[in-house]
Amino acid sequence: MQVTQEKRPGSRVGLKIVVEADQVKRSYEKTLRQLERNIQIPGFRKGKAPRNLVIRQVGRERVMASAVDDLINEAIQQALKDTQLHPISRFELDDKVEQLLDRFNPEADFSFSGYVEVYPEARVGQYKGLTVTATRVTVKPEQIDQLIDRWRDQRATLLPVEDRPAQLGDVVVIDFQARDAEGNPLEEIAAQDFQLELKEENFIPGFVAGVVGMQLDQTKEITATFPDDYFRKELAGKTVTFTVCLKEIKTKELPELDDAFVQEISEFQTVAELREHLQKRLEQDALRQSEENLETAILNAILETTEVDLPETLVEQETTQLLARSLQSLQQQQGVTPGEIRKFLSQLPPETLNQLMERHRPEAINRLRRTLALSAIVRQEQIAVGPNELEVEVEEVMAAYAQQGQKLDRERVRQAVHEDLLANKVMAWLKSQTTVNWVDSEGNPTEPPTLSPRSEGEDRQERSESARAGVPETEFEAEKPEGSAIPEAVEPPVDAKAEGEVATEPQAALPSVEAEASGIPEAVEPSAEAATDPAGLQLEQAVAETPKAGKKSKKDK
């Protein structure tokens, strides 16, 4: 088999493939044998009918279509392997189905051409000798109290209230129904026994303020306006009227902050021990976040002089991954089940789903540009991961997951760990080439933090020690009420921390070994769909739909 490559516009690589006559004949015979085994002809046992009867039963056109389909798919698979291309899209044929069938001869060479989209190569400008400004993150004394208060709030006891109206901080149970400006009910914005904590940020602007002051069993109309950037475009900026019935009022009784409480939420024995541990953790997080600020500053500077043509296929794939990740985050943080997510998505109008995708598109493009820029620098500077350090890290990851009772595919772990290590190496190299001006959260010059080279293993060990100590690491998220009518959390959680302050969100205890690339795409395998039908031909179906001679299909007109 002969394969010729050519560069095409964008990120496309053209392939011209010539299959020799002997291989064509073998493929044709293989197709016929498969048909003979599977076709039942009256008067013959399956697999025993003469070939000419099988061809007559199936139809010569469909036999030829099946043979061409098998031949092309096999040839594409071999061509991709020989050329070591890693496509991000299926193989697209240059010729129409009719043209392929017209020139197919089981006794002669067979040629065809097409293209695949591959990862584009970024054209990186300046990345050595950069000067950047990065924000140093510091720990504020009140952050420890905020963390502890959050855990106390999470374990609060809800006590019924009957002698006063609802006030901020209460948890209420309500029924509500929304109506548009014309008074028409909005069926999708309604709920029964909806539990809501009265915080302004917990619902659309104006709603919580309207509930505050209501008495038990009172029904009230509340006017509220959806934000202009609300993910459902048909509601964005719209003012609606809610008919609200207040059914229950509950107040929170927080547990006392004492040694008993500390022992309940952690393996520490005293409040002092917990505070000491949290101080250390926050300082570690401050260093880590300072380093992330530096990395972001470097990457932003590099992207200013980076050019890359992103194929739409790649952007769509990354956007879909980001949406999936935000839904997974919703599942993990608020206890929403995969079934509930699927139900929610199935009920979304197509235009709403498209709007969600559009919200993630800018981030997807930015992530791809960063990834491809780093990949180009890795190639240019010949940065690599040593086999020994890779295996050591793989063993640590496998052991860490094994302790949690999880068994992972070693090759997937190796790929994920390799990507992490390579990303760490290229960032470490870039930092060594960069001059940094450190500032505080107010933008004033400050002393640089003490950033020491750290391995993923060291970070993971620290976080595992915290996990073993039983210290809660997640922000308190209000439990999602059953029957939530407006699932705003479909969007990824917004990082509300101001730059220069330590976030109190958790750091993942273990690296992800999902299929997503963590930084540098060295080898993207074809999708399972591409593996089984790389060209997406479905020639047999196409032949069945091919118009007879002398007629044109609507597609051809």
UniProtKB/Swiss-Prot annotation:
Subcellular location(s): the record lists:
Cytoplasm
Q: Where does the record place the PPIase FKBP-type domain?
A: 169-255
Major location category of this protein: cytoplasm
What is this enzyme's EC? Answer: 5.2.1.8
Alphabetized InterPro entries for the sequence? PPIase_dom_sf (IPR046357), PPIase_FKBP_dom (IPR001179), Trig_fac (IPR005215), Trigger_fac_C (IPR008880), Trigger_fac_C_sf (IPR037041), Trigger_fac_ribosome-bd_bac (IPR008881), Trigger_fac_ribosome-bd_sf (IPR036611), Trigger_fact/SurA_dom_sf (IPR027304)
Segments of skewed composition (Basic and acidic residues): 455-466
The UniProt catalytic activity note for this protein reads: [protein]-peptidylproline (omega=180) = [protein]-peptidylproline (omega=0)
Any keyword Transport?
no
UniProt keywords, alphabetically: Cell cycle, Cell division, Chaperone, Cytoplasm, Isomerase, Rotamase
The enzyme's first-digit EC class, named in words, is isomerase
A biological process (GO) annotation for this entry? chaperone-mediated protein folding
- Give the top-rank taxon of the lineage listed in the UniProt record for this protein: Bacteria
Molecular function (GO) terms for this protein are: peptidyl-prolyl cis-trans isomerase activity; protein folding chaperone; ribosome binding
Gene3D superfamilies attached here? 3.10.50.40, Trigger factor ribosome-binding domain (3.30.70.1050), Trigger factor, C-terminal domain (1.10.3120.10)
Residue ranges for the region (Disordered) are: 438-557
Example of a GO cellular component annotation carried by this entry: cytoplasm
Q: What is known of its domains?
A: Consists of 3 domains; the N-terminus binds the ribosome, the middle domain has PPIase activity, while the C-terminus has intrinsic chaperone activity on its own.
Described by its record, this protein's role is as follows: Involved in protein export. Acts as a chaperone by maintaining the newly synthesized protein in an open conformation. Functions as a peptidyl-prolyl cis-trans isomerase.
What family does this chain come from, according to its entry?
A: Belongs to the FKBP-type PPIase family. Tig subfamily.
Q: What is this protein called?
A: Trigger factor
**What organism does the UniProt record list as the source?**
Synechococcus sp. (strain JA-3-3Ab)
